[in-house]
Amino acid sequence: METTMFKGSITALITPMNDDGSLDFSGFGRFVDWQVTEGSSGVVPVGTTGESPTLTHEEHARIVEYTVQVVAGRIPVIAGAGSNSTAEAVGMARHAKSVGADGVLVVAPYYNKPTQEGLYRHFMTVADATDLPLIIYNIPGRSVVDISVETMARMAQHARIVGVKDATANLLRPLQVRRAIRHKPFTQLSGEDGTVVSFLAAGGEGCISVTSNIAPRLCAELHRAWQDGRVADAMAIQDRLSAVHDALFCESNPGPVKYAASLLGLAGETCRLPLAPLAEDSRMRVREALTGAGLLN
């Protein structure tokens, strides 16, 4: 699949669970199909929002395979393949390739705090393992390490490293990356719903979104408006969803978005420990944001 397909509103999928914490595959299938029909430009299973840290390896693999089956080629599936073990990330990427995913999203290794050279070698090794396009996921708030612009430019020399999901919340970064990587197209996707229009203005091409779990049609329309040059329309949608973006991070992701999904009848709110149920004041904030945006009566 052409890497130019990795643009627009791409949903970082929640993983629906039953009350006992087991996976709700039937609910997940309906949810993924709804994402496609509502206009999402792509989906990312088993990322941060999909609770990858608390999934078993077998569950991770099943979710990726099932997502590919449900999507059935209608939009790109970018499989989460991140780990703080390079060998484990390679295994996830190879599995994603074997079941028909269109690309992989690989997070910067967390907890073990590699140097920039270690980061470079990690991503190059994963990129060498398959012929899938690889999107770097830079989220220093969770991984502690920040992939520098210089390191990213080195990585971009690899033909299969095609872009980045930037969750630094630093709006200088897309400008810096665009200047540093000029030898080929390099897709920059925002990892921050709240600043998405500003990110697009700085050269971004899309967003791997949490909010699109519950408002996929609006998120997709924002990106279509931007791509069509209807800046005022894109800003109007951003303004409408602004309080929702904020509320969905009032506690650790994906707790708030799963609660929002439960209010809308899309999925249950259950997360696996150590993520706890939302506090009552957080629940109120999410409800008020959804109501204010016209998503909940």
From Swiss-Prot:
Domain of life, per lineage: Bacteria
Localization per Swiss-Prot or TrEMBL: Cytoplasm
Top EC group: lyase
InterPro entries assigned: Aldolase_TIM (IPR013785), DapA (IPR005263), DapA-like (IPR002220), Schiff_base-form_aldolases_AS (IPR020625), Schiff_base-form_aldolases_CS (IPR020624)
Binding site for pyruvate: 49, 208
UniProt key word Translocase: no
Record bears the keyword Acetylation: no
Principal subcellular localisation of the protein: cytoplasm
GO molecular function: 4-hydroxy-tetrahydrodipicolinate synthase activity
Catalytic activity annotation: L-aspartate 4-semialdehyde + pyruvate = (2S,4S)-4-hydroxy-2,3,4,5-tetrahydrodipicolinate + H2O + H(+)
Family according to the record: Belongs to the DapA family.
Record text on subunit structure and interactions: Homotetramer; dimer of dimers.
Name listed for the protein in its UniProt record: 4-hydroxy-tetrahydrodipicolinate synthase
Organism listed in the record: Gluconacetobacter diazotrophicus (strain ATCC 49037 / DSM 5601 / CCUG 37298 / CIP 103539 / LMG 7603 / PAl5)
Source species taxonomy: Bacteria, Pseudomonadati, Pseudomonadota, Alphaproteobacteria, Acetobacterales
